[in-house]
Amino acid sequence: MAVTRLKPADPQIPDNIILSTVDAMLNYCRAHSFWPVTFGLACCAIEMMAAGGARYDIARFGYEVFRPSPRQADLMIVAGTVTRKMAPLVRRLYEQMPAPKWVIAMGSCAISGGPFVDSYNVVPGVDTIVPVDVYVPGCAPRPEALINGLLALKKKVINPKVALVK
């Protein structure tokens, strides 16, 4: 976050005044309190639930509030295989989320269709349905990988001008 410290004109003014833009402050707050929607499609959802458990504890980063409704969430973690029958529902959930909203594609099935990519009923990547901000590769990715993806998204939200390599 870009913070500018100015020398006070009056020595009576305390030195703990920080000047910044409203957008920078809002992005800083948003990056430290993602509210993911509870949404798992396959095996990767088990690893996503494990990341919320006591061993990995994503609560220490402020991301523990899994919301039951997309209208209360700002992050969708697509964890697992997206089928053609499920694709319109994924799109609808994304559209119901309030802005600003972000998407993490978790696992090789969500990223590219995984081992089922040649199937007639599997979508070859969730990025064909909704815009994806961060990709977390693996089959199934470990909870540490999801935490790494959340931290990468945090950097992207704090400084939106920096493009991350997908």
UniProtKB/Swiss-Prot annotation:
Keywords: 4Fe-4S, Cell membrane, Iron, Iron-sulfur, Membrane, Metal-binding, NAD, Quinone, Translocase, Transport
Enzyme's top EC category: translocase
GO molecular function, one term: quinone binding
Catalyzed reactions: a quinone + NADH + 5 H(+)(in) = a quinol + NAD(+) + 4 H(+)(out)
Cofactors, names only: [4Fe-4S] cluster
EC code(s) of this entry: 7.1.1.-
Membrane topology (UniProt): Peripheral membrane protein
Record keyword Protein transport present: no
InterPro entries the UniProt entry points to: NADH_UbQ_OxRdtase-like_20kDa (IPR006137), NADH_UQ_OxRdtase_20Kd_su (IPR006138)
Matches recorded under Pfam families: Oxidored_q6
Compartments where found: Cell membrane
Any one GO BP annotation for this protein: aerobic respiration
Cofactor note: Binds 1 [4Fe-4S] cluster.
Record-listed [4Fe-4S] cluster binding positions: C43, C44, C109, C139
Predominant location: membrane
One GO term describing the cellular component: plasma membrane
Record family assignment: Belongs to the complex I 20 kDa subunit family.
Job of this protein: NDH-1 shuttles electrons from NADH, via FMN and iron-sulfur (Fe-S) centers, to quinones in the respiratory chain. The immediate electron acceptor for the enzyme in this species is believed to be a menaquinone. Couples the redox reaction to proton translocation (for every two electrons transferred, four hydrogen ions are translocated across the cytoplasmic membrane), and thus conserves the redox energy in a proton gradient.
PANTHER family for this protein: NADH DEHYDROGENASE, NADH DEHYDROGENASE [UBIQUINONE] IRON-SULFUR PROTEIN 7, MITOCHONDRIAL
Record's subunit section: NDH-1 is composed of 14 different subunits. Subunits NuoB, C, D, E, F, and G constitute the peripheral sector of the complex.
Name of this protein: NADH-quinone oxidoreductase subunit B
Gene this chain is encoded by: nuoB
